[in-house]
A protein has these predicted regions:
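Acidic, proline/glycine-rich low-complexity IDRs
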Residues: 1, 44-45, 223-224
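Long, contiguous interaction/recruitment modules in multidomain scaffold/adaptor proteins
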Residues: 1-11
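Alpha-helical protein-protein interaction scaffolds
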Residues: 11-12, 18-141
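N-terminal low-complexity, intrinsically disordered segments
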Residues: 130-164, 195-196
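Helical scaffold of the NTase/Pol beta-like nucleotidyltransferase catalytic core
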Residues: 151-183
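Short edge beta-strands and adjacent turn/loop segments
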Residues: 180-202
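A short interface-forming secondary-structure element
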Residues: 202-215
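Short, non-transmembrane amphipathic alpha-helical segments
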Residues: 214-224
């Protein structure tokens, strides 16, 4: 049986997942080890993407945004994919959406990267791209269960005449409001969206690791 070598990308991905799963309980050694592995990854854009994801994973949002800002797109379509992923990790949803929407749908299909693009479109509230991709790749039936909540969310926005970029801006404002509870604390925040059971309310979810006594202050920050 042949054993394939583990690439630097795979090693970094595994280490990043360990840090994310630790809920802030990672060691300085773990952090430095990831830094060292990223340095071995070929390609400037790929390096910057991984640095961005690392700093976002540990709640160092300013540094994550700084790393994302240094991404050069001279490498073409693949670089735009990576830039979108990096900006998404840094909670820069508008920038992430801009880059993922710059990749032609035909190129996404040719690269067999529709799954990656769909996840980025979903995470950055880029519903027009999501619907276009699902139609172009004939993937609507296969992905309906996974992306059904997003499609219902998009349908509700359309019915009320709410542009998707307004939603992105709103979510970014919410993330900025709660940043004191995770930025610099080794924690990361995740967003999601769906509709209620009777499809009368569009719901944006923000998953933030926090202590029970912090809940009240977080709710006040979100509502102000």
């Amino acid at each position: 049986m042949a054993i394939s070598a583990v690439t630097n990308d795979q090693a970094v991905g595994r280490m990043l997942n360990e840090i994310l799963d630790s809920n802030g309980n990672y060691t300085e050694f773990q952090f430095r080890r990831v830094i060292g592995e990223i340095a071995k990854v070929p390609g400037h854009v790929r390096k910057q993407m991984l640095y961005t994801m690392l700093y976002a994973a540990v709640g160092e949002l300013r540094e994550a945004k700084n790393q994302a800002a240094h991404i050069s797109l001279s490498e073409g379509t693949a670089a735009e994919f990576l830039a979108a992923a990096a900006y998404h990790a840094a909670n820069m949803l508008t920038e992430a959406s801009r880059y993922i929407r710059r990749v032609p749908v035909e190129a996404i299909v040719a690269l067999e990267a529709s799954g990656f693009a769909l996840l980025n479109a979903q995470g950055t509230f880029s519903f027009e791209l999501m619907e276009l991709l699902m139609n172009k790749t004939n993937a609507h039936a296969g992905n309906k269960e996974q992306f059904g909540g997003s499609l219902a969310f998009a349908k509700m926005l359309k019915s009320h005449g709410i542009p998707e970029d307004h939603v992105r801006s709103y979510v970014e404002e919410c993330l900025a409001a709660v940043s004191p509870w995770y930025e610099g604390k080794g924690k990361s925040v995740v967003t999601g969206h769906t509709v209620d059971d009777v499809e009368k309310k569009a719901i944006v979810d923000i998953y933030l690791p926090a202590e029970p006594e912090e809940f009240g202050d977080i709710m006040v920050a979100l509502s102000s």
